[in-house]
């Protein structure tokens, strides 16, 4: 990832500015110079406020059409939509088209909500990222060695519980090994979550805590459990009450709270995923949303509406400087002041991006597995780079 960011940085054109000064012979000349400077500054501000992104819009739309893209991409600057594309079919059986407000599963983009939940609880004095896990999971063998921060930054060594495999031409994530005997399609949400937690807390660590980075969904499932333990609420209820409702995110929900495949406004997966286990995506890949709601959410992060600037800064910091891979808390810093995360769930792929200083948000999502992360997401990074260079 750092190699990718380095390549991105090499594409940035740095412009220098020179200044000159001149002696003023009279007060009136000084006054005129000041007026000219003010006028030029005002004109410059007006020009900056009216940046033209029509080329970026055209490039984005044409490229996505060439990909036969099915989904939505929206880029906003300071609350104004500057690029937006909605293409493809919401439901191939009916021919209904995707619209900007269509809902999608966002996969691991959900992790930033879990991280934000932890940061909110820390701000309220109800936990600390430096807390040892033994505080929340008494009797856990490695509870004295691991912290909440290790989970957030993917530096815990806790084993990944997913086995990735292709089943019926769908990339499906299955419970690993012995876990598949207790986490099943026939179980309830609570039964699967209890079985998963027990399994995770019995596994040996895959590396010494905080010695390296390894992406593991298990970290964020356990973080969601910590949110439940500390708040006394179900994780979904906590996120809904803390974020969805205050922000008016009425098109956002959780796959375990609804009959998600039959949501009327959901872009249907292009291939039916036959093995989606209830409960086990909690905190790591369980949110359904749309471009409207996600832009509101990303703006709230940028503007510190619900959590502080200190917390957001912690989320977009790099906790693995010794590694080629970069990770913060539920977000991946891009090395240029922004941060993003990808998401994957059955045939859905998503990307969310913020740049606090430039006041930029991007949300991109597809319901078609043909458009993997190396496809439309690279295009999104490219367009964002063009916008940042303006």
Labelled PLM ranges:
Residues 20-24, 44-86, 275-390:
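Catalytic loop of the DD-peptidase/beta-lactamase superfamily, centered on the K-T-G motif
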Residues 3-98, 122-127, 153, 157-158, ...:
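N-terminal leader/targeting segments and the immediately adjacent pre-domain N-terminus
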Residues 146-346, 350-351:
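Short, surface-exposed loop or secondary-structure junction motifs
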Residues 67-71, 94-150, 207-216, 282-285, ...:
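Short active-site loop at a secondary-structure junction
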Residues 81, 133, 139-140, 255-262:
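Short, solvent-exposed turn/loop segments enriched in Gly/Ser/Thr/Pro and often Arg
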Residues 56, 106, 110, 114, ...:
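Hydrophobic (often cysteine-bearing) scaffold residues that line and stabilize catalytic clefts
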């Amino acid at each position: 990832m750092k190699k990718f960011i380095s390549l991105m940085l090499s594409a940035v054109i740095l412009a220098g500015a020179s200044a000159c000064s001149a002696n003023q012979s009279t007060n009136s000349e000084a006054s005129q110079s000041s007026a000219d400077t003010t006028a030029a500054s005002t004109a410059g501000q007006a020009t900056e406020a009216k940046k033209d992104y029509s080329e970026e819009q055209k490039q984005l739309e044409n490229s996505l059409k060439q990909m036969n893209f099915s989904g939505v991409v929206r880029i906003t600057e300071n609350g104004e939509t500057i690029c937006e594309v909605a293409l493809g079919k919401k439901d191939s059986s009916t021919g209904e088209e995707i619209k900007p407000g269509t809902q999608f599963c966002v996969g691991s983009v959900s992790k930033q909500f879990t991280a934000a939940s932890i940061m909110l609880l820390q701000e309220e004095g109800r936990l600390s990222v430096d807390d040892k896990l033994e505080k929340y999971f008494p009797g856990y063998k490695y509870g004295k060695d691991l912290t909440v921060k290790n989970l957030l930054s993917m530096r815990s060594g806790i084993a990944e519980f997913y086995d990735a495999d292709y089943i019926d031409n769908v990339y499906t994530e299955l419970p690993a090994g012995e876990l598949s005997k207790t986490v099943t399609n026939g179980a309830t949400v609570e039964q699967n979550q209890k079985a998963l937690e027990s399994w995770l807390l019995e596994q040996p660590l895959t590396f010494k805590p905080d010695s390296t980075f390894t992406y593991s969904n298990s970290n964020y499932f356990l973080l969601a459990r910590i949110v439940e333990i500390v708040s006394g609420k179900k994780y979904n209820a906590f996120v809904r009450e803390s974020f969805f409702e205050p922000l008016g995110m009425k098109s956002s929900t959780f796959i375990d709270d609804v009959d998600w495949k039959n949501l009327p406004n959901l872009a249907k997966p292009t291939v039916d995923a036959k093995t989606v286990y209830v409960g086990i995506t909690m905190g790591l890949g369980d949110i359904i949303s749309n471009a409207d709601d996600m832009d509101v959410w990303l703006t709230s992060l940028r503007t510190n509406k619900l959590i502080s600037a200190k917390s957001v800064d912690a989320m977009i910091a790099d906790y693995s400087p010794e590694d080629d891979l970069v990770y913060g808390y539920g977000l991946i810093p891009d090395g240029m002041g922004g941060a993003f995360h990808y998401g994957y769930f059955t045939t859905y792929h998503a990307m969310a991006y913020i740049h606090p200083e430039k006041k930029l948000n991007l949300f991109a999502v597809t319901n078609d597995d043909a458009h993997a992360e190396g496809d439309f997401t690279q295009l999104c990074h490219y367009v964002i780079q063009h916008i940042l260079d303006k």
